[in-house]
Amino acid sequence: MTMPLQIYNTTRRELAESVLTEVVTTVLQEEGFLIESLVAVYCGNKMIHRINREFLGHDYPTDTITFSYSKGSEIDGEFYISLDAVEENALRYKVGFDEELMRVTIHSALHLAGYQDGKDEERVQMQEKEALYLKRFVTPST
């Protein structure tokens, strides 16, 4: 029997896969979706750059790429997250790696739930949702 959510880590960095599973599942359930089939791949810049170039025509690495094949309220899709980009973002935004990893994972799940970030108003709505979910999963560092 296959699992509805499969997580693959192609890097040497250790990840708390059970926490990532909980984050993705919670976001999608609370947005009104069930996971039919979802693959989450945590990779490096080299892999995500290749995917970005081949499938989206963008010749640069990015933090996340999401592909949705969903119909209705059942999620069928995949997302890729570059841990190199997550690390760069964490330094840029002066947050911990784990917090930024949660944010990008939430961001990916929100894309699967239909949220977009191409326009300013869409980006603001998505950032508000990210902040809402992030508060639940990240303990503020003091």
Curated annotation (Swiss-Prot):
Biological process annotations from GO: rRNA processing
UniProt-listed Enzyme Commission number(s): 3.1.-.-
Hydrolase is among the record's keywords: yes
Any one of the GO CC terms: cytoplasm
InterPro entries for the chain: MetalPrtase_cat_dom_sf_prd, YbeY, YbeY_CS
UniProt binding sites for Zn(2+): H107, H111, D117
Chief place of localization: cytoplasm
Cofactor(s) named in the record: Zn(2+)
NCBIfam families per record: rRNA maturation RNase YbeY (TIGR00043)
Task performed by this protein: Single strand-specific metallo-endoribonuclease involved in late-stage 70S ribosome quality control and in maturation of the 3' terminus of the 16S rRNA.
The protein's name in its UniProt record: Endoribonuclease YbeY
Organism: Chlorobium phaeobacteroides (strain DSM 266 / SMG 266 / 2430)
Gene that produces this protein: ybeY
